[in-house]
């Protein structure tokens, strides 16, 4: 069975107000109404999840969150639990994004010299979150990717493979088959410098082979692997045409309904072409 392309918008800390998030969703919904052969999700800030979820109810667009803690409840100031996300209607949750791991694509002086310790997610904490999400029927979007120094040192495959092996420890092949993995080279995120499509495809293929070795052929064939990192309406078609890339995790371009819908339509067109082929 062919994998259904999956386009997800990671809005990050945008827009600042819930009513602005509602406006963005209202602009997006008619642009993708009736679209086929592709799944779409948006991941707004936590403060807008309820408002956006109400608007999406009954639509073809699903709701996702940008992160979560692994405990269901307790004395964890500032955290959001998987139960809370399920309660507001989330289907997806992004886990292990490089910005949560403290790995940024470009310097941000506002973060100061300790930027790498702002959030500090590790493979171990991502794994705890992953298993908690699965317990509560949330579909994880697990992000992996290398920094520029790691790429220049020829360590891309080791870094990405290691993140997959450690992050997915203790889960079953059936669970892996139903989740989403996202290759996001850290040096491409928010920089306007996307990974070249053939290289993105190569690394996504590496991810699939890593899954095959760890979880078997069926899981590797079923798991969807997105590319993320400066995906735009200009480069989406080339990226999404690659055989190992099953969708995109879109940052800045997802904040513009016209640009985001263009990416979604590109995925739909490619899926229809592949089906005909």
What are these regions (language model features)?
Residues 1-277:
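Active-site loop-to-helix "anion-binding N-cap" substructures in soluble metabolic enzymes
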């Amino acid at each position: 069975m062919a994998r259904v392309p999956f386009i997800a918008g990671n809005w990050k800390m945008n827009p600042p107000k819930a009513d602005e998030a509602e406006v963005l969703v209202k602009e997006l919904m008619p642009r993708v109404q009736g679209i086929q052969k592709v799944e779409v999700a948006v991941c707004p800030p936590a403060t807008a999840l309820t408002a956006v979820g109400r608007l999406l109810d009954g639509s073809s667009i699903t709701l996702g969150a940008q992160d979560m803690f692994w405990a269901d409840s307790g004395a964890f100031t500032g955290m959001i639990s998987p139960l809370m996300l399920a309660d507001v209607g989330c289907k997806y949750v992004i886990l292990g994004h490089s910005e949560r791991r403290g790995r940024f694509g470009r310097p941000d002086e506002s973060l100061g010299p300790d930027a790498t310790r702002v959030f500090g997610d590790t493979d171990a904490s991502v794994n705890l979150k992953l298993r908690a999400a699965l317990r509560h029927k949330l579909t994880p979007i697990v992000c992996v990717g290398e920094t520029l120094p790691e790429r220049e040192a020829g360590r891309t495959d080791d870094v990405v493979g290691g993140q997959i092996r450690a992050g997915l420890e203790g889960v079953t092949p059936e669970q892996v088959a139903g989740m989403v993995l996202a290759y996001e080279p850290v040096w491409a995120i928010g920089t306007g410098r996307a990974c070249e499509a053939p290289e993105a495809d190569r690394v996504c293929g590496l991810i699939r082979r890593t899954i095959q070795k760890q979880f078997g052929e069926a899981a590797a064939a079923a798991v969807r692997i997105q590319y993320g990192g400066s995906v735009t309406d200009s480069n989406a078609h080339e990226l999404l045409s690659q055989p190992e890339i099953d969708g995109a995790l879109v940052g800045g371009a997802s904040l513009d309904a016209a640009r985001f819908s263009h990416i979604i339509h590109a995925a739909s067109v490619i899926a229809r072409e592949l089906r005909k082929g």
